[in-house]
Amino acid sequence: MANSFLDSLTLVRQNTPLVQCLTNSVVMQFTANVLLAAGATPAMVDTPAESAEFAAVANGVLINAGTPSAEQYQGMTKAIEGARKAGTPWVLDPVAVGGLSERTKYAEGIVDKQPAAIRGNASEVVALAGLGAGGRGVDATDSVEVALEAAQLLAKRTGGVVAVSGAEDLIVSADRVTWLRSGDPMLQLVIGTGCSLGALTAAYLGATVDSDISAHDAVLAAHAHVGAAGQIAAQKASAPGSFAVAFIDALYDVDAQAVASLVDVREA
């Protein structure tokens, strides 16, 4: 994993991948700042008239239905169509799927459009796979361990990578399961850390798509980058407000060697 991470982080910072974020209004600014700090370029283009066209020139696309409107649903559908035609990797973040019927129906309708990755908490992933009812809004009520079967089903169904966020992250593809221990509990006290991880996942996939790095390792590296930055930020911050600032700084400052020393990766 270390070599893949070194290469992934280098490619993100060298290539400055352009990430189209169709995301929720609560986290839009934070997501943009996370991408910039990590070395990517954000673009919040989500209107139906422009989404498909932009997805064709972007390096990665994030679909996050956290605060959806009818117009944004249309924009998301168009962006997915544009991404698929252009071969642009797109990431699905199924926010609160299983807990709310309309977004659950929408997510179930697009999951077979071959997302390069799905990133969510355990309850969202379980619900998306049809194995449970979902959590409490953006909060998971299932453990990451419980989501393993659901993640494996979704990985086989989509051909992509499924990432389950929790105290220990789980990264699953058709023939591989990886556990990642990193981060800090303070990450849960700053809104947008999970949603921005979906955007960073799209950045890593976009930066490495033409390389020898697997999609699995690219998704793993994105999660390791965030986890290590969270640990560094927690050492410098005293409360959530200062943590948010320190987290952005750490995403910018951290190098691959530091990340490798801060995270624990286990192949199942």
Swiss-Prot record:
Cofactor(s) annotated in UniProt: Mg(2+)
Pfam family, one: HK
Similarity annotation: Belongs to the Thz kinase family.
Protein name: Hydroxyethylthiazole kinase
Substrates-to-products reaction catalysed: 5-(2-hydroxyethyl)-4-methylthiazole + ATP = 4-methyl-5-(2-phosphooxyethyl)-thiazole + ADP + H(+)
GO molecular function, one term: hydroxyethylthiazole kinase activity
Top EC class for this record: transferase
Assigned EC number: 2.7.1.50
Keyword Nucleotide-binding: yes
Sequence positions that bind substrate: 44, 192
GO BP of this protein: thiamine biosynthetic process; thiamine diphosphate biosynthetic process
